[in-house]
Amino acid sequence: MATLFIADLHLCVEEPAITAGFLRFLAGEARNADALYILGDLFEAWIGDDDPNPLHRQMAAAIKAVSDSGVPCYFIHGNRDFLLGKRFARESDMTLLPEEKVLELYGRRVLIMHGDTLCTDDAGYQAFRAKVHNPWLQTLFLALPLFVRKRIAARMRANSKEANSSKSLAIMDVNQNAVVSAMEKHQVQWLIHGHTHRPAVHELIANQQPAFRVVLGAWHTEGSMVKVTADDVELIHFPF
């Protein structure tokens, strides 16, 4: 058996191929897992659990079917869907996890997270993140009419795209010191995360021992998952 990790699907109605690929994954590979962990940015945007977008209901039903088959499903918020709440979690039968979680997997201690908090060189993004994670601001935003939230979200995505276009790739990647700090804080030799869309397995030193950082890929033209078993930790890409 295996525990599966995915992230950065960025599901939206404009990308039906990714949605179809995810549905096939949920109906196939995911059903044979010990557990499924979604490490953020499942959706391209999330403006509230009350959004009647049919895609959201479709995904909730598909994830719940995995849970109903006996495979527990877990979710860590990403920078795109950090407002995903308890209502959607109930509808999909997913367990919401904190932004950093340590798992005991087949004899390994594994730290999982979305990964955006590791990009500490991007001061502009970190300042923005601190603002939008303010509980009072989130409560105010979610109290706005749905059409207003849609406009605000569209403007924020456009601003983010424009800002990122002028940033260096290095600034938008993780900071190595932040990685080591997180791994030593939690006393782990394995870290799995997404966010950067740069799939790879990196070797480093943490806790004065060899350690590994496994980065999930985004679902653009193919799927990406990390498969953890008693024998191995694999970063796998697969066709939709």
UniProtKB/Swiss-Prot annotation:
Q: Which GO terms describe its molecular function?
A: manganese ion binding; UDP-2,3-diacylglucosamine hydrolase activity
Q: Major location, coarse class?
A: membrane
Q: Is Lipid biosynthesis there in the keyword field?
A: yes
Q: How does it sit in the membrane?
A: Peripheral membrane protein
- Which positions are annotated as binding Mn(2+) 1? D8, H10, D41, H197
GO CC terms in record: cytoplasm; extrinsic component of plasma membrane
Compartments where found: Cell inner membrane
At which positions is substrate bound?
N79, R80, D122, S160, N164, K167, H195
What's noted on cofactor binding? Binds 2 Mn(2+) ions per subunit in a binuclear metal center.
Q: What class of enzyme is it?
A: hydrolase
- Keywords annotated in UniProt: Cell inner membrane, Cell membrane, Hydrolase, Lipid A biosynthesis, Lipid biosynthesis, Lipid metabolism, Manganese, Membrane, Metal-binding
Q: Does the keyword Hydrolase apply?
A: yes
Q: Pfam families attached here?
A: Metallophos
UniProt EC number: 3.6.1.54
Which coenzyme or cofactor does it need?
Mn(2+)
Which InterPro entries does this chain map to?
Calcineurin-like_PHP_ApaH, LpxH-like, Metallo-depent_PP-like, UDP-diacylglucosamine_Hdrlase
PANTHER family annotated for this entry? Answer: UDP-2,3-DIACYLGLUCOSAMINE HYDROLASE, UDP-2,3-DIACYLGLUCOSAMINE HYDROLASE-RELATED
Q: What does the UniProt function comment say about this protein?
A: Hydrolyzes the pyrophosphate bond of UDP-2,3-diacylglucosamine to yield 2,3-diacylglucosamine 1-phosphate (lipid X) and UMP by catalyzing the attack of water at the alpha-P atom. Involved in the biosynthesis of lipid A, a phosphorylated glycolipid that anchors the lipopolysaccharide to the outer membrane of the cell.
In which family does this protein belong, per the annotation? Belongs to the LpxH family.
- UniProt-recorded name of the protein: UDP-2,3-diacylglucosamine hydrolase
Species source reads Shigella dysenteriae serotype 1 (strain Sd197)
The encoding gene is lpxH
